[in-house]
Regions:
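An alpha-helical, amphipathic repeat domain used for nucleic-acid recognition
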Residues: 1-174
Length: 174
């Protein structure tokens, strides 16, 4: 009997895909959480939402809270670290308002968002200028060009003060 025939016969012995899934041992919540955190950092709310989908009928829902506390105690789950990482990575493309919105979507508390954005304080005009220069060249000459750039920067979450500085060609904050 060939190797291919053996593999096919074993696969047919296991039944359908649904039957194979039922016999597959389920992962614990802790191992799922560690696997998710190994890929990228998560906020507590985001990880809780993802893990809640995997709580079985026979599992205690309070186990999720214990897993999150254990991960926090071991330093694997930190909303402060997550907020800082998101703020740093998004600061290359977005303004403070958009970063604040994204952090709120991830379930980060407003005080942690403010602390993460405080580390970026004073850089918004420079970041807006950088984003604008990647998309446009030179200073706008017509009102239509100014409006187009202002809409673009506003859609990226930059403040009006920063937008006006970019449109006027100022390099120093007022």
């Amino acid at each position: 009997m060939s190797l291919c025939a053996v593999l096919l016969s074993r696969r047919s012995d296991l039944g359908t895909k649904a039957e194979r899934q039922r016999h597959k041992p389920s992962k614990s919540l802790l191992s799922r959480a560690i696997a998710l955190l190994a890929r990228r950092d998560h906020s507590r709310a985001e990880l809780s939402r993802k893990l809640a989908r995997h709580i079985g009928e026979d599992e205690d829902p309070s186990e999720l809270g214990r897993v999150l506390v254990e991960l926090g105690r071991n330093g694997l789950l930190s909303d402060e670290r997550f907020a800082g990482a998101v703020a740093r990575s998004r600061s290359q493309r977005f303004g403070d308002a958009r970063i604040r919105y994204d952090l709120r979507r991830f379930g980060i508390a407003d005080d942690l968002s403010a602390a993460a954005l405080a580390k970026l304080a004073g850089t918004e005009a420079a970041r807006a200028r950088e984003v604008s220069s990647r998309r446009f060249t030179g200073l706008p000459t017509t009102a239509a060009e100014r409006a187009k750039r202002a809409r673009f920067l506003q859609s990226r979450g930059f403040s009006l003060d920063s937008i006006y500085q970019v449109l006027r060609g100022r390099t120093d904050p007022e």
